[in-house]
Amino acid sequence: MLLQRQFEMPESFFVLSKDYLELATDEITALAKMHDRFSKIKIISNLVIVQSKTNWNEISKRATFVKISGQILRKMSGLFLDEENVGVLKNAKTFVCRIINLSSNQINIPELENSMGDMISKFSHAKVNLENPDITVYLIFTNNENFFGFSKRTKKMARTKKIKKFPHELDWKLTRVMINLIGLEKGETVCDPFCGTGTTLLEAESMGIHGIGLDFDEKMCKIAKANLKTNGYNSEI
């Protein structure tokens, strides 16, 4: 039964920035396992494939170094599309095709994207929209496998703002990764004993995690409070 359950679980893909790639892949793994301990992970360079019951966007919206993400529909042995492949466009009014080449082969990306768009148009009533499509269709090339996938339009998360900064404060990306590697879930609490300008608290609150901050410097506590207030967060300082 377990094998059948895993076989039927959908696959998601995450194309990561190559900055801190090892941390980035560990973060995706931690987030996937946090939501579903039966998740299976496959890493191909800066592409991470996750087989899990968890929706790709639940992982992507918390991850730090994800450039592109979505759901895999199938592996591709060739560039052949049929009605089954484009069924995801059934209720979409607009779409765009995007090629992600992670292989060592030279590919004429604009030409291939146009060809894909033409093929999809034969099976779907959706129109091409390059700026703000309902669905983005992806063809991902690697040296060993090709994948056909998609993502639906999602609302972009606003970055937290700081009205006051400090030269030696924590980098927000590394801070967010650390929180995610710990595996804290929404509604849980993180405590930062040296909160400084509030970077850890801001990142935690942006993911629905409560924060408690301490600092021996009263000036830093005031700065952290001001930064939290600007974003409407209520971490305890």
Located regions from the model:
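Basic, glycine-rich polyanion-binding accessory segments appended to enzymes
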Residues: 94-100
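Class I S-adenosyl-L-methionine-dependent methyltransferase catalytic core
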Residues: 2-61, 65-68, 72-75, 103-118, ...
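An N-terminal amphipathic alpha-helical segment
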Residues: 75-91
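Acidic/proline-rich low-complexity IDRs
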Residues: 1-2, 88
